[in-house]
Amino acid sequence: MNNNTRVYRMSFAGVYPHYIAKAEKKGRTKAEADKIIYWLTGYDEKALQQVIDDKTDFENFFNQAPKMNPNVSKITGVICSYRVEEIEDPIMQKVRYLDKLIDELAKGKAMEKILRD
């Protein structure tokens, strides 16, 4: 099983608490992390909770996302040693987009800049 397949099969519910913890450890809030997820994927609070309750894997989390934000192409930079804009695998790129946005939140970047609207 290659690394991408391993990530695809990971439950979003298993990773979500780490996103929240990363934000909170740096003085940011769960609400801000959730807002980033809503912005990126189009999920709302109820739909996100359903994904968590169902233990949906990352592949389906992104494939079933209500509406990926049209401004995702504005997300650039390096995360986990990869330039997000150069990742060719569409699901892996979306995973890294989310990682990048949560990382920016934890680094203290203003929400207006993170959300790139």
Please place each PLM-identified region on the residue numbering.
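A charge-rich, low-complexity, intrinsically flexible signal that marks solvent-exposed coils, linkers
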Residues: 1-117
